[in-house]
Design a protein with these regions (language model features):
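A C-terminal junction/extension of Radical SAM enzymes
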Residues: 126-145
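Conserved AdoMet/S-adenosylmethionine-binding subsite of the radical SAM
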Residues: 1-122
Length: 145
């Protein structure tokens, strides 16, 4: 395995399969988890286009990581006009006290389904960062350029 060769293993996840996440972490197979939080839990059906999405699974993964069993980060890719300040107030509430949180700007690859998606302004990102900073000490903007 990679771990036997001395490599550290990072798992990127959307958090929708908390049982798989827990098994991977508790088995020692994973050293670091990066979890995407797409939006506030109440907005997931709209953003993901899945009316009956079970957001309790995402919350379970968030709570598991908050328990501190593994090093982790949460992150949100900010897409305008899909995100607004209320999203980040609600995200801050459910991730309060997390180790680190990154905001990253949407980058249009040219291969997206919706044509009305665009990157936020630096001012918008800064405003969202300030909202999250009320709940989280280590929050920053990650440059994806």
């Amino acid at each position: 395995s990679l771990k036997d060769l001395g490599y550290l293993v990072k798992l990127d996840t959307n958090g929708y399969m908390p049982d798989v996440l827990k098994r991977a972490v508790e088995s020692g197979a994973v050293d670091y988890v990066a979890m995407d939080i797409k939006t506030s839990l109440d907005e997931y059906p709209k953003l993901c286009g899945v009316e009956n999405i079970d957001t309790s699974r995402i919350k379970e993964s968030i709570d598991f990581l908050l328990s501190g069993v593994v090093d982790y980060e949460f992150r949100t890719t900010v897409v305008e006009p899909l995100h607004h300040k209320e999203n980040f107030e609600k995200i801050g509430e459910i991730t309060k006290g997390c180790l680190r949180y990154y905001l990253q700007s949407f980058v249009d690859s040219g291969n997206i389904i919706g044509k009305n998606c665009f990157p936020p302004t630096q001012e918008q990102l800064q405003n969202y960062l300030e909202i999250l900073s009320y709940y989280i000490k280590n929050v920053s903007i990650r440059d994806r350029g």
